[in-house]
């Protein structure tokens, strides 16, 4: 077998990993072995937290809609149910935006939905 000298390739590989972890604290940004382990762990956390943030935002939207709906004397579940039954295509994100930025418009939507018989 022929000898493979991979000095420049190995340096580039290590440099890329150390650049990736440059903002980490202590040895995790300076020593290659610990940096490589931290990099793997950070990518795993990033993957998990990507889905957790979606979950957290949905909870936030529901809380905002519920607070605005209760101000108008109706519960969150009945708002969503009425919207679904009347085929009004407003998602939770949009409803939460309307509820926080334009309370009058949200009240009009609630009034319109609650008048229609289910």
UniProtKB/Swiss-Prot annotation:
<dbReference type="Pfam" id="PF00453">
    <property type="entry name" value="Ribosomal_L20"/>
</dbReference>
<dbReference type="InterPro" id="IPR005813">
    <property type="entry name" value="Ribosomal_bL20"/>
</dbReference>
<dbReference type="GO" id="GO:1990904">
    <property type="term" value="C:ribonucleoprotein complex"/>
</dbReference>
<dbReference type="GO" id="GO:0000027">
    <property type="term" value="P:ribosomal large subunit assembly"/>
</dbReference>
<dbReference type="GO" id="GO:0005840">
    <property type="term" value="C:ribosome"/>
</dbReference>
<keyword id="KW-0150">Chloroplast</keyword>
<keyword id="KW-0694">RNA-binding</keyword>
<comment type="function">
    <text>Binds directly to 23S ribosomal RNA and is necessary for the in vitro assembly process of the 50S ribosomal subunit. It is not involved in the protein synthesizing functions of that subunit.</text>
</comment>
<dbReference type="InterPro" id="IPR035566">
    <property type="entry name" value="Ribosomal_protein_bL20_C"/>
</dbReference>
<keyword id="KW-0934">Plastid</keyword>
<dbReference type="GO" id="GO:0009507">
    <property type="term" value="C:chloroplast"/>
</dbReference>
<comment type="similarity">
    <text>Belongs to the bacterial ribosomal protein bL20 family.</text>
</comment>
<protein>
    <recommendedName>
        <fullName>Large ribosomal subunit protein bL20c</fullName>
    </recommendedName>
</protein>
<dbReference type="GO" id="GO:0019843">
    <property type="term" value="F:rRNA binding"/>
</dbReference>
<dbReference type="GO" id="GO:0006412">
    <property type="term" value="P:translation"/>
</dbReference>
<dbReference type="GO" id="GO:0003735">
    <property type="term" value="F:structural constituent of ribosome"/>
</dbReference>
<keyword id="KW-0699">rRNA-binding</keyword>
<keyword id="KW-0689">Ribosomal protein</keyword>
<dbReference type="InterPro" id="IPR049946">
    <property type="entry name" value="RIBOSOMAL_L20_CS"/>
</dbReference>
<keyword id="KW-0687">Ribonucleoprotein</keyword>
């Amino acid at each position: 077998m022929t000898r493979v000298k991979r000095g420049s390739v190995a340096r580039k590989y290590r440099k890329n990993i150390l650049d990736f972890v440059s903002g980490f604290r202590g040895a995790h940004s300076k020593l290659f072995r610990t940096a490589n382990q931290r990099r793997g762990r950070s990518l795993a956390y990033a993957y998990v937290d990507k889905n957790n943030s979606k979950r957290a935002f949905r909870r936030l939207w529901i809380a905002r809609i519920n607070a605005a709906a209760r101000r108008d004397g109706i519960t969150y579940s009945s708002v969503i149910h009425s919207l679904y039954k009347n085929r009004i295509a407003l998602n939770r994100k949009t409803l939460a935006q309307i509820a926080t930025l334009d309370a009058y418009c949200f009240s009009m939507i609630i009034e319109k939905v609650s008048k229609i018989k289910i």
